[in-house]
């Protein structure tokens, strides 16, 4: 188990147990995804929570103000506990681990689909069918991303499998093939 998981797993497992005992798992998972999105998209938030300059009470007050009406009371307690224990800077890792454990418990495969441009519903539906056959399960959580550097096509990551059907990937493979010939 990686060192970071040694720190994050106990928090994630305990919080999932609390959520299960209160029948809040689905709600908590949705909230965890929202907070992770905020953490990853707002460097001011993650920097403030990771800052050694801000005192614990200031961080807890900020968390209370930001999330008291957005999350369950048990989720707010987790946030405050992480602040008290000087672990709030690891919030993203704790929440990512929580989502991993949630998926493991429910046998949900995470598929990340990165495309060169946004996919319409028909494209998403068609791609979903193919990803389900690759993953060997209908129980999938799809994470759609857009990366214009792919130039065209898409890249699918499911577990340890990677399917690169992007133009950038084809160009890279062509370059490698030409390098072998020369």
Curated annotation (Swiss-Prot):
It comes from the Bacteria. Keywords: ATP synthesis, CF(1), Hydrogen ion transport, Ion transport, Membrane, Thylakoid, Transport. It is a peripheral membrane protein. GO terms for cellular component: plasma membrane-derived thylakoid membrane; proton-transporting ATP synthase complex. It is found in: Cellular thylakoid membrane. GO terms for molecular function: proton-transporting ATP synthase activity, rotational mechanism. Pfam families: OSCP. F(1)F(0) ATP synthase produces ATP from ADP in the presence of a proton or sodium gradient. F-type ATPases consist of two structural domains, F(1) containing the extramembraneous catalytic core and F(0) containing the membrane proton channel, linked together by a central stalk and a peripheral stalk. During catalysis, ATP synthesis in the catalytic domain of F(1) is coupled via a rotary mechanism of the central stalk subunits to proton translocation. NCBIfam families: ATP_synt_delta. F-type ATPases have 2 components, F(1) - the catalytic core - and F(0) - the membrane proton channel. F(1) has five subunits: alpha(3), beta(3), gamma(1), delta(1), epsilon(1). CF(0) has four main subunits: a(1), b(1), b'(1) and c(10-14). The alpha and beta chains form an alternating ring which encloses part of the gamma chain. F(1) is attached to F(0) by a central stalk formed by the gamma and epsilon chains, while a peripheral stalk is formed by the delta, b and b' chains. Belongs to the ATPase delta chain family. This is ATP synthase subunit delta.
């Amino acid at each position: 188990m990686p060192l970071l998981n040694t720190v994050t797993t106990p928090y994630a497992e305990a919080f999932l147990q609390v959520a299960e005992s209160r029948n809040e798992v689905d709600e908590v998972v949705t909230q965890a995804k929202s907070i992770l999105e905020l953490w990853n998209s707002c460097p001011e938030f993650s920097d403030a929570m990771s800052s050694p300059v801000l005192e614990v009470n200031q961080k807890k007050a900020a968390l209370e103000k930001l999330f008291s009406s957005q999350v369950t009371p048990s989720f707010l307690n987790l946030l405050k506990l992480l602040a008290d224990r000087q672990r709030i800077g690891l919030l993203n890792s704790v929440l990512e681990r929580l989502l991993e454990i949630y998926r493991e418990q429910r046998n949900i495969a995470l598929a990340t689909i990165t495309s060169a441009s946004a996919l319409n519903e028909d494209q998403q539906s068609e791609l979903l069918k193919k990803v389900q056959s690759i993953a060997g399960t209908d129980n999938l959580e799809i994470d759609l991303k857009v990366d214009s550097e792919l130039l065209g096509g898409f890249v699918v990551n499911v577990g340890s499998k990677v399917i690169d059907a992007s133009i950038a990937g084809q160009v890279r493979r062509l370059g490698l093939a030409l390098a072998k010939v020369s």
